[in-house]
């Protein structure tokens, strides 16, 4: 049954960075994931309040967390959660009608009904892959709404889908589909589809993401829209960028192009760009503490799942190309949304933290699992390890800014800058905005 969570030691994906978990660890993980599935809303608040329990538990699991660490992670995250909306069986039945289904997309109070509908569809077809293909990749009117929503709200639904696919869990896949269907839209569908049409009209091969960052910096109208005050994240996309500089960002984003022949390299390029944005968006030269941007962190944490989805031969090559193309384009959008920060390459290249020093990946995984966090740091570190593995063969390319041990340096930075912090000062939010740094001024020792 797709409503049952059953993580198996034989189905932990390819990005496991610890020994196979013992049976008691898997038993506890399944118990906690089932409680989450059966009782908790996928949104802890209506606007971009994403329940991270699945992300947190599964990531820590493959980084080697003990049962005690997993229970602590669950307990830390639980107080912010809320109960699922009520189930309405008659609505679940009506969702089989495509026109009715389409009318309910973006309605957050329909999450439980969407969840039960997708569970029933998976059980009826005895194939979660067929359901994902129809509702995400078929290019039907419904799929053309669901796929953009997978990226909305800082990539949370596609992270959830990626985890479900990685661990082969129909129940988690149903959660991801329901989350995307119920998610508010911030204009990603317009952005993606318009950029896609514009790219189709271009004959040239496309440009690198690093070069396109420079085009954003060199476009005053886009910089101004990205630095508007009073709007955060996706709300800035909907109310500023797509209102005041839509043509400019679409023109630039459409220049990132992926083909079947370039898919592997362009996936690596995207992973690399995300790490570069997260590590290099600093103001240490101006006397501020090192910090990682909250939204660039999400660009990184989601990046690993484009490696995972890219390995799925049941997804057509055409759709795997589209996945990466859209991800790179939205990463460019996020650079604008975060206020077009200056990027300090040298800081990343030479970074060394007081606590983490020369710590290895294995040592870092161990202390991250001890950290009281909602899973963002663990996800970030795991995604960077994947990035290092994927990008190694391409690092000679000029578009690959992050090379060698810089991956580990950025991972150490994530732990170093978040330990002994609270949720309000763990990350800098929109690193290109002057006001974002006001609480991170280095205090004089005089």
Swiss-Prot record:
GO BP annotation list: monodictyphenone biosynthetic process; secondary metabolite biosynthetic process; xanthone-containing compound biosynthetic process
Identify the metabolic or biological route this protein is part of. Answer: Secondary metabolite biosynthesis
Q: Does the keyword Flavoprotein apply?
A: no
In terms of Pfam families, this protein maps to:
Questin_oxidase
InterPro entries according to UniProt: Questin_oxidase-like
Q: What is its EC number?
A: 1.-.-.-
Which UniProt keyword terms apply here? Answer: Oxidoreductase
The yes or no answer to whether the keyword Nucleotide-binding is present is no
Q: Which cofactor does it need?
A: NADPH
GO MF annotation, one: oxidoreductase activity
Task: Report the gene knockout effect.
Answer: Impairs the production of monodictyphenone, but still enables the synthesis of intermediates until emodin. Results in major accumulation of chrysophanol and its 6-hydroxymethyl shunt product aloe-emodin.
Q: Which domain of life is it from?
A: Eukaryota
Please give the family membership noted in the entry. Belongs to the AflY oxidoreductase family.
Role noted for this protein: Baeyer-Villiger oxidase; part of the gene cluster that mediates the biosynthesis of monodictyphenone, a prenyl xanthone derivative. The pathway begins with the synthesis of atrochrysone thioester by the polyketide synthase (PKS) mdpG. The atrochrysone carboxyl ACP thioesterase mdpF then breaks the thioester bond and releases the atrochrysone carboxylic acid from mdpG. The atrochrysone carboxylic acid is then converted to atrochrysone which is further transformed into emodin anthrone.
Protein name, entry field: Baeyer-Villiger oxidase mdpL
Organism the protein comes from: Emericella nidulans (strain FGSC A4 / ATCC 38163 / CBS 112.46 / NRRL 194 / M139) (Aspergillus nidulans)
The gene name reads mdpL
